[in-house]
């Protein structure tokens, strides 16, 4: 996979040289190219911003440097590029909320281009124009505002790159974590390691009992409980057809009942057992 990142703060992307993402680049699994937006300016001050039409606070990034920068990227495609071109990812507080499902979708692409806005964002005509040429996804990390898109690029890149074959040593671990499709997008169950007892807190006995079926059942139950109490919005989207009788019983205890293609909360919530010392 190739990633092109257009930014005015290339130093911000240096953490991509570390840890598993850095190793993936060294192994040829990932090709990250950071491009300086200011290289596409034509005044001695290398200006990339100006005041917004209609007034208002702050400055807006000009379309001309962005047009030249993105055109230069598109003119240099990788050999395995999709005939439709790259997916242009624009971090923005007005974009779709980035999820694990979005990470999976982007990980299937051979080429991503990131446009890192600053100040009050990028002139709206840039996204409008490139929607006619490539696939564009405006993406938000959540309901808050950052100073620029670089932090979002770091997060999205890590979420996407770790899904590429060979980046994570044990690929099975990708299916045993929060939001994994293989576990219906539920939050991950509580996890424990040695010692068995620490500061008066014991590992649940079922995990040390050697009964693998019981362990898997406990993990599923705890995933359901944790999701119900911490992310009810996720649980509401759980497909009842994916639930067995035990799942339905656990959810009923928590006040959740099937409702069409999802679940509906209709009772009093039960405390998250992972926050207690109970097995």
Swiss-Prot record:
GO terms for biological process: tRNA N1-guanine methylation. SUPFAM superfamilies: alpha/beta knot. Keywords: Cytoplasm, Methyltransferase, S-adenosyl-L-methionine, Transferase, tRNA processing. InterPro entries: Alpha/beta_knot_MTases, tRNA_m1G_MeTrfase_C_sf, tRNA_m1G_MeTrfase_TrmD, tRNA_m1G_MTases_N, tRNA_MeTrfase_TRMD/TRM10. GO terms for molecular function: tRNA (guanine(37)-N1)-methyltransferase activity. Gene3D superfamilies: 3.40.1280.10, tRNA(m1g37)methyltransferase, domain 2. It catalyses: guanosine(37) in tRNA + S-adenosyl-L-methionine = N(1)-methylguanosine(37) in tRNA + S-adenosyl-L-homocysteine + H(+). GO terms for cellular component: cytosol. Its EC number is 2.1.1.228. S-adenosyl-L-methionine binds at residues 117, 141-146. The keyword Transmembrane does not apply. The keyword tRNA processing applies. Residues 256-279 are annotated as: Disordered. It is found in: Cytoplasm. CDD domains: TrmD-like. NCBIfam families: PRK00026.1, trmD. PANTHER family: TRNA (GUANINE-N(1)-)-METHYLTRANSFERASE. Belongs to the RNA methyltransferase TrmD family. Homodimer. Specifically methylates guanosine-37 in various tRNAs. This is tRNA (guanine-N(1)-)-methyltransferase. The gene is trmD.
């Amino acid at each position: 996979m190739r990633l092109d990142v257009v930014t005015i703060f290339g130093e911000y992307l240096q953490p991509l040289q570390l840890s598993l993402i850095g190793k993936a680049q060294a192994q040829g699994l990932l090709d990250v190219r950071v491009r300086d937006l200011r290289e596409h300016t034509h005044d001695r001050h290398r200006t990339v911003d100006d005041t917004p039409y209609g007034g208002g606070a702050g400055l807006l990034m000009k379309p001309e440097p962005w047009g030249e920068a993105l055109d230069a990227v598109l003119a240099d495609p990788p050999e395995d590029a999709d005939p439709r071109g790259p997916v242009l990812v624009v971090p923005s507080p007005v974009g779709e909320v980035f999820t694990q499902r979005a990470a999976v979708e982007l990980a299937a692409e051979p080429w991503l281009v990131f446009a890192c806005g600053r100040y009050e964002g990028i002139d709206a005509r840039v996204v409008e124009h490139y929607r006619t040429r490539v696939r564009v996804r405006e993406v938000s990390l959540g309901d808050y505002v950052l100073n620029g898109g670089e932090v979002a690029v770091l997060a999205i890149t890590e979420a996407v790159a770790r899904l590429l074959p060979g980046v994570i040593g044990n690929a099975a671990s990708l299916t045993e974590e929060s939001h994994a499709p293989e576990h219906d997008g539920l939050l991950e169950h509580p996890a424990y390691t040695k010692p068995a007892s620490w500061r008066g807190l014991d590992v649940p006995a079922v995990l040390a009992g050697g009964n693998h079926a019981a362990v898997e059942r406990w993990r599923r139950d705890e995933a359901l409980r944790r999701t119900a109490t911490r992310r009810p919005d996720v649980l509401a989207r759980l497909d009842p057809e994916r639930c067995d009788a035990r799942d339905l019983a656990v959810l009923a205890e928590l006040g959740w009942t099937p409702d069409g293609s999802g679940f509906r909360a209709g009772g009093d919530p039960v405390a998250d057992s992972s926050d207690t010392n109970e097995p």
